[in-house]
Amino acid sequence: MYAVLVTGGKQYRVVQGETLRVEKLDVETGSDVTFNSVLLMGSSDGIHVGEALKDASVTAKVVAHGRARKVRIIKFRRRKHHMKHQGHRQYYTEIQITGISGPAKQ
């Protein structure tokens, strides 16, 4: 069984047991988090699609918090000997999917 969930303005396709990095969540390491905004669920029974499926949720355990690799931005003006460097490191939360519960069969 797999699901497509939305968190941090991005969509992720997940299966149980998978570990992935999502945008920073304000939860403690080791705690459980539930995602209720599930857009799609697929299994051997078929596919359930909806704007946000009712009674569908994905539970995950927070493994770690961290910062991604540095993204470097360079702006320059041609022929003017002007260059500006900037960069940042995005915060992320690493989660492990522990369960996917879907809507009741119809």
Swiss-Prot record:
Q: What's an example GO BP annotation here?
A: translation
Q: Is the rRNA-binding keyword given for this protein?
A: yes
Keyword entries, A-Z: Ribonucleoprotein, Ribosomal protein, RNA-binding, rRNA-binding
The superkingdom listed in its UniProt entry is Bacteria
A single Gene Ontology MF term assigned here is:
rRNA binding
Single GO cellular component annotation?
Answer: ribonucleoprotein complex
Q: Which residues form a coiled coil?
A: none
Give the quaternary structure: Part of the 50S ribosomal subunit. Contacts protein L20.
Q: Which family does it belong to?
A: Belongs to the bacterial ribosomal protein bL21 family.
Function in brief:
This protein binds to 23S rRNA in the presence of protein L20.
This protein is called what? Answer: Large ribosomal subunit protein bL21
* Naturally occurring in which organism (per UniProt): Xylella fastidiosa (strain 9a5c)
Per the record, the gene is: rplU
